[in-house]
Amino acid sequence: IEGKAATTDAVARIADGASGFRAFVEIPLADFAPLLDAVGERGLNAKVRTGGVTGEMFPEPEALLNFIEHACRANVPFKTTAGLHHLMRGDYRLTYDADSRKGTMFGFFNVFLTAAFVHAGMTDGAALALLLERDVKKFFVSSNAIRWGDRSVTTNDIRAARDCVAVSFGSCSFREPVDELHAAALIP
């Protein structure tokens, strides 16, 4: 079940109506903290938008990172949606129209790994650099860890982040994420 909430009262109404179901509450990134806290207190999951069909719909990286850090500290599960068609951050067409404008989009790999690293304890400015990383070749993936520069997260860290905080992401496309994972040799 999903719903949108711009107030803590709206979060409470969604919680009351979703009793017995796993519910995601879409909250705005602007002034998200009281809403995210209310979502967590009610045992719900958060949802935030990370893009759209215009450049203005993409949040500032610092705002998204602030949300991720807060969700990890509070152990509030969340999913991200919109604009996450691509593996890595980069400049891409905003729609599937041939003459579409381009904009800078987050990569689903960046967003998830940022959550995994933060959940595993990353507290310095490196998390923002990770969220902004554009080169998949800067990552080394093995059967027991993912390394980025001199930092790494184990598969147990990744599993914990996936189970506890960064539970899913939404993309308008199934093929693009899978194709880009194949192209980067991250999946067979």
Regions found by a protein language model. Name each.
Residues 1-188:
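Expand to "…catalyze enediolate/carbanion chemistry for C-C bond making/breaking, isomerization
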